[in-house]
Regions:
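Acidic-enriched and Gly/Ser
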Residues: 1-191
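Short beta-strands and strand-coil junctions in structured, solvent-facing domains, enriched
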Residues: 14-15, 123-125, 235, 244, ...
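Short coil-to-beta-strand transition motifs
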Residues: 35-40, 224-232
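Short, conserved beta-turn/loop elements at beta-strand boundaries and strand-helix junctions
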Residues: 48-52, 238-243
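Conserved glycine-centered short motifs in functionally critical loops
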Residues: 159-228, 236
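Basic/aromatic-rich interaction segments and small domains that mediate binding to polyanionic partners
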Residues: 239-260
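Intrinsically disordered, low-complexity linker and terminal regions at domain boundaries
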Residues: 257-287
């Protein structure tokens, strides 16, 4: 078994694994490590973990050292450089009349690369912009176009629940969220009700989906033909949490409320999005 630690390079970023070697590493410590982008400084987010080495396709790199006072000074200088680079890049974008919005700038610890994150509605030819930035900063320049979900994660904000965005508070990685989840959970398919500030489906739709899927396995769906104590009918409404169904009776069109355990399913239905729903919700899925 290999002893590892987990390191984050952003406050709510993905966790990467490293070998602590002989260092006494604690939660929250700053460590210097080598990554695909070069030498970086990250914060320890996991400690005292042991994992089978065969789970890793590549050898686990060891940390270079615990961050020193001089390393922390370097980080402060890099933060200031990022602020200056942001202002200069905005000026260059305006000068080139490019239709793009600068979101964030990141300077690698070894000062070997500047990364500029931006959003744009379409593809942008930024080759001349890269040349200008390289001439100013004399280092490698990388421009990276991000989606609206990543933009929300970087900028932060408050959701309709009044809480800080999940993505900028604790979600290390985005999970796929689909309109089918909202449909299965019986939520209103009004886009303003189920989409976040980013304009995509709210990440929290994913949190209870497993529980709803388990309930759906044992509950008739809307449109199912069932047999009740009063006769046959069609399920018009389902409350998965209470286990109660509204059933329209065949014999007199009356609607009765029954418990799912008190009926017999003759023919079940499936949950489908109709054409109008698909059209209205187009664009809510994706990045």
């Amino acid at each position: 078994m290999l002893k590892i630690i987990g390191v984050r390079f952003k406050s709510v970023g993905k966790i990467y694994y490293f070998n602590p070697k002989d260092y006494d590493v604690k939660m929250g410590d700053k460590v210097i490590v080598e990554t695909a982008r070069g030498v970086e400084c990250g914060e320890v987010a996991l400690v005292d973990r042991k994992i089978d080495e065969t789970r890793f396709t590549n050898p686990v790199k060891g940390i270079i050292r615990l961050a020193t006072p001089n390393d922390m000074k370097t980080i402060e200088k890099n933060r200031q450089k990022e602020k200056d680079a942001f202002k200069i890049c905005e000026q260059k974008i305006a000068a080139h009349k490019l239709k793009m919005n600068l979101i964030d700038v990141e300077c690698t610890f070894d000062n070997n690369k500047l990364l500029f994150y931006f959003t744009a509605e379409s593809r942008v030819d930024f080759r001349e912009l890269v040349k200008d930035l390289a001439a100013v900063f004399r280092t490698r320049i990388e421009l990276r176009q991000i989606g609206v979900r990543d933009e929300a994660k970087m900028l932060g904000g408050l959701g309709i629940c009044g809480q800080p965005f999940c993505c900028s508070r604790f979600l290390g990685e985005f999970q796929p969220v689909s309109i089918k989840m909202a449909k299965e959970q019986g939520l209103s398919l009004n886009p303003t009700k189920i989409s976040g500030t980013c304009g995509r489906l709210m990440c929290c739709l994913k949190y209870e989906q497993d529980s709803y899927e388990d309930l759906l396995k044992h509950t008739p769906k809307v449109g199912a033909i069932v047999k009740t104590a009063d006769g046959r009918g069609v399920v018009e409404e389902v409350n998965l949490l209470t286990g109660k169904l509204r059933v329209k009776m065949d014999k007199n069109d009356n609607v009765v409320v029954v418990k799912k355990d008190d009926i017999e399913v003759i023919k079940d239905s499936v949950i489908r999005l109709d054409r109008d729903e698909i059209k209205a919700l187009k664009g809510l899925e994706g990045k």
